[in-house]
């Protein structure tokens, strides 16, 4: 699959045969200007605040410079739990309406799945034999509403034959939340309390990585098959966009595909 440029973070897992997973960094060869500099891949609807033409150009450059096997299946993410199954390759590079979903799965070689984030947790799932992949946008709302479990269930591979990579997200020493987030997890599962540490009355730091590991293991993955974590989008402004840190922020992409 070749060597990737410095503005790409390749998944730190034992890659399944033919599977590639990576996240882009903000300092890639994009055309966006501050505060979206440089490689902002955020929604062309303008949700991220960047000029749509800049996002379009950045997406085109991404495909060309990474030599992707096809145009990525961009999603309209809404912090929901809808899982899109991709059964065909895109027929052209023409812009199409992005389907509303927060996860996607495929077994089609050459189909590029993509998730956009800027603090939420991107998760890549793959069959250990390389036959199937999935990507998930797992913010706290999605995690609480079982988006990971739903994506595992949407895959045709048995959970014990899956592995996962947890991409860059807001870290457990920087992501402070209130009672609403704490209650969304702990009221349903007291074991989730270990992913929260008190900062001040009514506020906690939350460990999205720990919550995701709990959810994935509950869905049937083994602990040793879950990789990644340890990064923090909030505290690393040189590499990552962060909505929590900057408010007006771009989005980076986490992509996965099965080689043709």
Swiss-Prot record:
> What is its biological role?
Purine nucleoside enzyme that catalyzes the phosphorolysis of adenosine and inosine nucleosides, yielding D-ribose 1-phosphate and the respective free bases, adenine and hypoxanthine. Also catalyzes the phosphorolysis of S-methyl-5'-thioadenosine into adenine and S-methyl-5-thio-alpha-D-ribose 1-phosphate. Also has adenosine deaminase activity.
Q: Which GO terms describe its molecular function?
A: adenosine deaminase activity; copper ion binding; oxidoreductase activity; S-methyl-5-thioadenosine phosphorylase activity
Catalyses which reaction?
adenosine + phosphate = alpha-D-ribose 1-phosphate + adenine; S-methyl-5'-thioadenosine + phosphate = 5-(methylsulfanyl)-alpha-D-ribose 1-phosphate + adenine; inosine + phosphate = alpha-D-ribose 1-phosphate + hypoxanthine; adenosine + H2O + H(+) = inosine + NH4(+)
Question: What's the EC number here?
Answer: 2.4.2.1, 3.5.4.4, 2.4.2.28
Write out the residues that bind Zn(2+). Answer: 79, 120, 137
Which organism does this sequence originate in? Answer: Xylella fastidiosa (strain Temecula1 / ATCC 700964)
Q: How does it assemble?
A: Homodimer.
Cofactors, names only: Cu(2+); Zn(2+)
Q: Which Pfam families match?
A: Cu-oxidase_4
Q: Which CDD domains match?
A: YfiH
| Keyword Cell membrane applies | no
What domain of life does the native source organism fall in?
Answer: Bacteria
This chain belongs to the protein called Purine nucleoside phosphorylase PD_1754
Listed A to Z, the keywords are: Copper, Hydrolase, Metal-binding, Oxidoreductase, Transferase, Zinc
Name the family the entry cites: Belongs to the purine nucleoside phosphorylase YfiH/LACC1 family.
């Amino acid at each position: 699959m070749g060597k990737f440029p410095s503005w790409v973070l390749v998944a730190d897992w034992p890659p399944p045969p033919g599977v590639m997973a990576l996240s882009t960094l903000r300092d890639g060869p994009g055309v966006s200007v501050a505060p979206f500099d440089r490689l902002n891949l955020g929604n062309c609807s303008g949700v991220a605040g960047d000029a749509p033409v800049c996002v379009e150009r950045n997406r085109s450059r991404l495909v060309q410079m990474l030599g992707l096997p096809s145009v990525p299946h961009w999603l309209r993410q809404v912090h929901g739990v809808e899982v899109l199954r991709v059964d065909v390759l895109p027929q052209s590079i023409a812009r199409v309406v992005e389907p509303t979903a927060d996860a996607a799965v495929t077994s089609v070689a050459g189909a590029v799945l993509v998730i956009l984030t800027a603090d939420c947790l991107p998760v890549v799932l793959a069959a250990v034999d390389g036959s199937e992949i999935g990507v998930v946008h797992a913010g706290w709302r999605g995690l609480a509403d079982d988006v990971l479990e739903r994506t595992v269930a949407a895959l045709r591979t048995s959970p014990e034959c899956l592995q996962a990579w947890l991409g860059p997200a807001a870290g457990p020493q920087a992501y402070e939340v209130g009672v609403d987030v704490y209650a969304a997890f702990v009221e349903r599962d007291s074991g989730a309390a270990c992913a929260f540490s008190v900062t001040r009355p009514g506020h906690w730091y939350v460990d999205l990585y720990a919550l995701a590991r709990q959810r994935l293991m509950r869905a049937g993955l083994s602990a040793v098959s879950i990789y990644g974590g340890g990064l923090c989008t909030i505290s690393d402004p040189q590499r990552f966009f962060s909505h929590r840190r900057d408010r007006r922020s771009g989005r980076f992409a986490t992509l996965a595909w099965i080689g043709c």
